[in-house]
UniProtKB/Swiss-Prot annotation:
Segments for region (Important for the catalytic mechanism of both phosphorylation and dephosphorylation): 209-218
Enzyme Commission numbers on file: 2.7.11.-, 2.7.4.-
Cofactor or coenzyme needed: Mg(2+)
Function field: Catalyzes the ATP- as well as the pyrophosphate-dependent phosphorylation of a specific serine residue in HPr, a phosphocarrier protein of the phosphoenolpyruvate-dependent sugar phosphotransferase system (PTS). HprK/P also catalyzes the pyrophosphate-producing, inorganic phosphate-dependent dephosphorylation (phosphorolysis) of seryl-phosphorylated HPr (P-Ser-HPr).
Binding site for Mg(2+): S168, E210
Protein's recorded name: HPr kinase/phosphorylase
Residue positions binding ATP: G161, E162, S163, G164, L165, G166, K167, S168
A molecular function (GO) term: ATP binding
The UniProt record lists the keyword tRNA-binding: no
Gene name linked to the record: hprK
Length: 319
C-alpha cells in the first residue's frame, strides 16, 4: 500500500523549522495535494521534486537563483509567458530558494491560480535533498510483518516464526549480548527506494518487548539507550521452525541462498530449527556473520563445492 495524500499546509508545517520558509502566495490553497496518479507512477522522489522544468509537470518546482534569472531575463512579454507556463505544469507547490525575491508577476499569478508559493533563504540543492528524502519516506510502499526486528552486529535482522517458538525470548538474549531492538511483534516496513526496505517500530510499541511469563519489558529503561534503535534497513530474515517442519520442508544444506519477497524486494533468508538444548542466539549471530561475508562476496558453500570438485578430479587422476 502506498499513501497518496499530503497537503501543502502539511508540507509547510513539516519544514517550518528546518527551512524557515514563508508562505508568500496561494494561502487559500492550503489543501492542495499531489496528483494521486502521479504518486502511483513515481519511481522515486526525484520524480516529485526538482528544479523548474517545463517537461516535468505535477511536481514541486524549485526556483533557485538560475531559475529566477531565467524567468526575469528578456522582454516583459517573454517573462510573463515563462511565468504563466508554470501554472500549466500544475505543481502542488512552488518553492523560491537561495533567498530569491519573488517577481511581482509570479506573486500575482500564484495568487490568481491559488498556487502555494513558499520562500526560503536555504540553498535550492538543500531544499531538493530535504524534500526528496521526506517524500520518499512519506509515499513509500509499506506493509507490516509479525516478528522481532533487531540490529544484530550492525545488520537489520527480522526474526520470524510461528507463535510459541520463543522469538521474543531470543530477542531478549540477543539484547543481553549487546545487540539492539527495533521492534517486537508488529514491525512497520517501508520500501524507501528501488532496493531498500526500512523497518521501524509503531509508536505504541516503542522500546517494548513482550516475554511470556514476565510481561512487557521496557528495553530502553532496563538496558539503556544503546539497546534500542529507531530504525534499521532490513537485510536478513531468520525464520525459526520446529524440527518436524524443518525436516519436511527444507534442505539441510541449501544449494542456493534462500530469499523472501518483501514489498517486491528479495531479502536473504536463513532457516533455523528450534530444538531443546540448541543455543539459538549463537546460531543467529553466526548466520548474520555468514551473511555479512556473503555480501562481501565470500561464499563458503561455493568454496566448499569447488574444493569438493577439485578433490574428486584429483582422485580420478590418481586412478
Amino acid at each position: 500500500m502506498k499513501p497518496t495524500v499530503i497537503s501543502a499546509d502539511a508540507m509547510f508545517e513539516e519544514f517550518r523549522g528546518s527551512l524557515r520558509w514563508e508562505w508568500l502566495a496561494g494561502l487559500g490553497a492550503s489543501e492542495r495535494q499531489f496528483d494521486p496518479e502521479v504518486i502511483s507512477r513515481a519511481q522515486s522522489a526525484a520524480d516529485l521534486v526538482g528544479y523548474l522544468n517545463y517537461i516535468h509537470p505535477y511536481r514541486v518546482q524549485i526556483l533557485g537563483a538560475r531559475e529566477v534569472a531565467y524567468l526575469t531575463r528578456g522582454s516583459q512579454e517573454d517573462c510573463a509567458r515563462r511565468i504563466a507556463r508554470i501554472v500549466t505544469l500544475e505543481p502542488p507547490m512552488l518553492v523560491l530558494a537561495d533567498g530569491q525575491a519573488a517577481p511581482d508577476e509570479l506573486l500575482s499569478i500564484c495568487e490568481r491560480a491559488q498556487l502555494p508559493l513558499f520562500a526560503t533563504r536555504e540553498s535550492s540543492a538543500f531544499v531538493i535533498d530535504l524534500l526528496r528524502a521526506y517524500l520518499s519516506k512519506h509515499f513509500a510502499e509499506r506493509t507490516s510483518m509479525h516478528g522481532v526486528f533487531m540490529d544484530i552486529l550492525g545488520m537489520g535482522v527480522m526474526i520470524t516464526g510461528e507463535s510459541g517458538l520463543g522469538k521474543s525470548e531470543l530477542g531478549l538474549e540477543l539484547i543481553s549480548r549487546g545487540n539492539g531492538l527495533v521492534a517486537d511483534d508488529a514491525v512497520d516496513l517501508f520500501r524507501i527506494n528501488q532496493n531498500t526496505i526500512e523497518g521501524r517500530c509503531p509508536d505504541l510499541l516503542l522500546n517494548l518487548l513482550e516475554v511470556r511469563g514476565i510481561g512487557l519489558l521496557d528495553i530502553r529503561a532496563i538496558f539503556g539507550e544503546t539497546a534500542v534503535r529507531r530504525k534499521m534497513r532490513l537485510k536478513l530474515i531468520v525464520h525459526l521452525v520446529r524440527r518436524d517442519s524443518f525436516e519436511r520442508d527444507y534442505e539441510r544444506m541449501p544449494s542456493a541462498p534462500l530469499t523472501q519477497d518483501v514489498l517486491g524486494i528479495p531479502v536473504r533468508k536463513v532457516i533455523i530449527q528450534v530444538v531443546a538444548g540448541r543455543n539459538i542466539a549463537v546460531l543467529v549471530e553466526a548466520a548474520v556473520r555468514n551473511s555479512i561475508l556473503q555480501l562481501r562476496g565470500i561464499d563458503t558453500y561455493a568454496d566448499f563445492v569447488a574444493r569438493h570438485h577439485k578433490a574428486m578430479e584429483s582422485g580420478r587422476d590418481g586412478d
